[in-house]
Amino acid sequence: MRLFERILGARFEALAPEVQALHRQVGIKEGEISLRASPIMQLFGFPPPCKDAPLWFGTREEENVAIWRRQIKDRELRSEVWQSGDLVVERMGVVTITSELVIAHGALSQETRGVRFMDLPLPRALWPRVTAREWGAAGTYHFKIVVRAPIIDVVLLAYEGWLRP
């Protein structure tokens, strides 16, 4: 049983088949991504803006920690994802976000429950606003993520795309 199956338990079956497949399998998936990253996010390793760029997404699990690797253009983004009670935690570089997984109409979204920067907890007022949604359509897995700056509400990062099953 993989990470999201463990966290969601029986609720996992309510996900669209394409979303279930992505979170059940390890290995490499291919697809496309369109990305808009602010200069500050580019400093954190995100590539410059691109449209319909090739995307390779690889997953593996080591001792209950999922390793996610995304190859976008010439950049590789790596994150570690694990379970904390009924929440999912993802660390990418110096930022760690704890989220609740929510299922509606077969789609999966994440609601932020905590943010750490350089392992220090941030007060809620300083949390970035993250909207993350995954869904299936016509046999393909789709995703859309938007990260907005706290207080000033400016888009720091937005990306969306798809992966083949």
Where do the model's predicted regions map?
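Short, compact, well-ordered microdomains
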Residues: V155-W162
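A short acidic/glycine-rich loop-to-helix N-cap element
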Residues: R148-V155
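Soluble ligand-binding/transfer domains with enclosed cavities or grooves
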Residues: M1-V147, Y159
